[in-house]
Amino acid sequence: MNKQLQDLLITIVAGMGMLLSTLDTGIINIALPFLKEQFQTSTDIAAFTITGYTLALAISILPLGVLSDKFGKLKISYLGFVLFGLSSLFCGLINNISLLIIGRIFQGIGAAALQATSAALITTLVSEKRKNSSIGILGIMIGLGPILGPSLGGIILSLSFWQLIFLINIPFVILGIACNNFLLNKLSEKNNKRQLDILGITINALMLVSLLLGLSLLNKLHLFIVGIILILSSLLLGIIFYYVELNNKHALIDIKGLKNNPQVISYLLQTVTFGFASAMIFLLPPFIFEQSYHLEVGQTGFLVLGAPTGLVLFSRISSKINNGDKNKLFSHIGLSIIIISLIFLLLINPNWPYQLLTLGLFIYGIGGGYFQPANIASIMQASPMEIQGSTGALQRMLQNIAISIGSAIGATCLNIWSNDLLLATRIGWGITLILVIISLKEVIKFFHHK
């Protein structure tokens, strides 16, 4: 097969999978009030359509990463497209909230297979000269999903055809399956003989359920203590997981390997920080535009596009000028620009023109555009080729968890200081700024000592 065609098809499969899996979260978020009315249920029950998807994705992504190393990234990606497509069709055809939640759980498992394999498909199968460009496109898809979701969801709901929020996935799934199937028939992958770590998977699942459910309860004052208990339980389970996996030959996460490779730990710390920061960037600005500047929802929806616009543009630009040897430099540049944007956002007050807030978001997007593709490439390059699927899955899981933590802390700030929006947002920006500075400082320290 023509190498250029192969690279194109792999990039389509990886990018399409990442876009679908991130797009679907944003679409369902805006549909919650509609689903509550449609199924005559409570907000808490309707919210399980989000919680079920998120938990299924988080729990299954690491095992699917291991399976992709064992059986092949293309096979697991193919499974992901099929499962995601069938569950999307199921969700679009049923008219029962319990069945919808079940469908969303299977959709989350399909999304996990797509996210677990996206970066690994590129790093193991795309030619060296196009690898960075493909990773840049993957970064664009990661940035587009969360922002296109709410916009697309709003348009679909305005048509009074809520089933379309699920059925719209089908044409893209068919394209992904067609490309994936063609590649499966033309390519062979090098696989390893890793075994599934059932004990590690079980502890990891319990840890993630406790953490994510605990985070979801933090902004409910009457359940705040329960949320804290669940989060503390997840920390205890995390400690148990660490010691169980440390000397496990078939560990779900190669703890011993990570301890011997502090470079990867530094990159993963950056990933977590960026996920946390991105959650704040998407959560806080709409409140500022609507409550401080008294703008309409339509205007707000347009003005918050600053961050994803910057991320999409500069993901493409940075990947064009980076041939793979500038990943460390671009990571540092990206984090430094993010720090500048957070300082700018921290200083903004309602007396400033609201356009400056969009400018601050755009500057953040520029930093993200430099940082994210370089960070993904750095993590994958620093990991052995035989565990690229597991590494990609770990990177996505950590970023997803960081997004959940950032969203929970941001929402908690807004609830605690509900009468002082400026203070609430500044505390959110301040926490984020400190984390990014620590992340950049630790990375620079590592490379300086190296």
What are these regions (language model features)?
Residues 22, 26, 92, 108-116, ...:
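Small-residue-rich segments within alpha-helical transmembrane domains of MFS-like 12-TM solute carriers
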Residues 35-36, 67-68, 152-160, 215, ...:
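Interfacial helix-cap and linker-helix signal at transmembrane-aqueous boundaries
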Residues 51-65, 115-119, 305-317:
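Central cavity-lining transmembrane alpha-helices of secondary-active solute carriers
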Residues 159-273, 277, 302-303:
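Hydrophobic transmembrane-helix bundles of small-molecule transporters
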Residues 65-199:
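Helix-loop-helix hairpins in multi-pass membrane proteins, especially solute transporters
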Residues 31-61, 298-302:
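Extracellular/periplasmic helix-loop-helix junction of adjacent transmembrane segments
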Residues 8-20, 28-30, 43, 226-230, ...:
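12-transmembrane solute porter fold
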Residues 116, 137, 142, 146-154, ...:
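Glycine/proline-centered helix-kink
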